[in-house]
């Protein structure tokens, strides 16, 4: 932790094609080894595939998918009297989008399609239709929070 106050948040520049900060954040999540050009190519070709397969605007479908993935509750471990409790807590808005994007990219990478463009496009379409690995992860997170509702009074 810094000694002299908190570190200011760096602002993300919107991407050149869709003019969306959310798209830039997704590009940053896809990017490996600083290869932004490759990440942009993957995302924009995935968006083209989404438009072809759904017949709707890719940005619309993507935003719908992210809204279906973002968690509202999660559990945090809290040590009380020698035992650990999984305490349900609300997720801050910024963390919601971060988790949503992280889960989308991770579950896209785990899919079986041949190219990353295909995997990402299919994961976005699945998430928009409330199916797929990322949405299942959100459901599991919510189930954990629901199951541990009894420990909600340990919140800090």
From Swiss-Prot:
One of the record's GO cellular component terms: small ribosomal subunit
A Pfam family of this chain: Ribosomal_S7
Gene Ontology MF terms: rRNA binding; structural constituent of ribosome; tRNA binding
Keywords: Ribonucleoprotein, Ribosomal protein, RNA-binding, rRNA-binding, tRNA-binding
InterPro entries recorded: Ribosomal_uS7, Ribosomal_uS7_bac/org-type, Ribosomal_uS7_CS, Ribosomal_uS7_dom, Ribosomal_uS7_dom_sf
PROSITE patterns, A to Z: RIBOSOMAL_S7 (PS00052)
Superkingdom of origin: Bacteria
Record-level GO BP terms: translation
Subunit comment: Part of the 30S ribosomal subunit. Contacts proteins S9 and S11.
Family the entry assigns: Belongs to the universal ribosomal protein uS7 family.
Cited function: One of the primary rRNA binding proteins, it binds directly to 16S rRNA where it nucleates assembly of the head domain of the 30S subunit. Is located at the subunit interface close to the decoding center, probably blocks exit of the E-site tRNA.
Protein name: Small ribosomal subunit protein uS7
Upper classification of the organism: Bacteria, Bacillati, Bacillota, Bacilli, Bacillales
């Amino acid at each position: 932790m810094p000694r002299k106050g908190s570190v200011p948040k760096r602002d993300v520049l919107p991407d050149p094609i869709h003019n969306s900060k959310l798209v830039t954040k997704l590009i940053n999540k896809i990017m490996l080894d600083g290869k932004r050009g490759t990440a942009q190519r993957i995302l924009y070709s995935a968006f083209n595939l989404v438009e072809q397969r759904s017949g709707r605007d890719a940005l619309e479908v993507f935003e719908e998918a992210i809204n279906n993935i973002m968690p509202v509750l999660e559990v945090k471990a809290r040590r009380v009297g020698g035992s650990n409790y999984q305490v349900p807590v609300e997720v801050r808005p910024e963390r919601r989008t971060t988790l949503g994007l992280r889960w989308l990219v991770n579950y896209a990478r785990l899919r079986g399609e041949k190219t990353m463009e295909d995997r990402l496009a299919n994961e976005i379409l699945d998430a928009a239709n409330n199916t797929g690995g990322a949405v299942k992860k959100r459901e599991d997170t919510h189930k954990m929070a629901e199951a541990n509702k009894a420990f909600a009074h340990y919140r800090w």
